[in-house]
Amino acid sequence: MKADIMKKFLLALLFAPAIALGAGAAVHLDKAPDLQGDKAALQNGARVFVNYCMNCHGLSFVRYNRLTELGLSEQQVMDNLMFTADKIGDPMRVAARAAEQKQWFGAAPPDLTLVARARASADGSGADWLYTYLRSFYRDEKRPNGWNNTLFPNVAMPHALWELQGELVLDAETHALKLATPGQLSVAEYDKEIADLVGLLVWAGEPGAGFRKNLG
C-alpha cells in the first residue's frame, strides 16, 4: 500500500511541473556532491531543511525517528529539529493544513520527500537539479514576490535562503548571475549549505540507501 502511494506521489511530482521543466531545459546543471555516506553533512542538511524549508514543505514519508539513522539521538532530534510535531514517531509534516496553504499561496507547496527522484532527467540527477536550482535565484522586480530563477523561470517560490546567499542579479547582456548584495555566508559556504540540504533530500527519497551502498 505504501509503495503504491509513493508511486502516485512521484508521478504527481513528475508531471505537474512539466511546463516549467521544459522552460529551464537549456540551463546547464551543476554537479551536486554525493554526501550519502557523510552523516555530519546530512545532519546539517536536516537543520537547514527544518529551519528554512519546513514552514512550507514537509517530508511526509519520513518520520522524525528516522533521523537517528544520521547519527542523531532521539533527544537531539526532539530538542533541535521537532517544531511541528509532538512525538518522535510523527511524520515530518508542516503545521499548516493544505487548505490553509492554498488560501495563502494559491496552491499548497509540494511535499519534498521524493523531489530528488522526481527531478532526475537525461540532463542530470535530481540532486544536480536541486543543487543548481537553489543557487540560481535572482532579484526580479517584475515578479510578484520579487524573485526569479534561471533554472525554473517564473517559479512561484520565493528565495527562502536569500539571507544566507545574499541577493544575485541577472546581467542583461551576459545572462550570468552576479552577487549584488552579500549574504551571511560566502559563496563557498552557501554552496556547502545547499549541498548538505540536497543531500538530505536525496536521503529522504530512500533513507538508508547511501549507507547500505557504503556497506556493500
Predicted features and spans:
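Post-cleavage N-terminal segment of exported redox proteins
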Residues: 1-36, 203-207
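Electrostatic cytochrome c docking/interface patches
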Residues: 24-47, 58-69, 77, 205, ...
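Gly/Gly-Pro-rich "capping" loops immediately C-terminal to redox-active cysteine motifs
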Residues: 35-36, 42, 61-127, 144-175
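Extracytoplasmic/secreted proteins, especially bacterial periplasmic and envelope-associated proteins
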Residues: 40, 44, 48, 111, ...
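Surface-exposed patches in mature extracellular/periplasmic domains of secreted proteins
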Residues: 142-147, 209-212
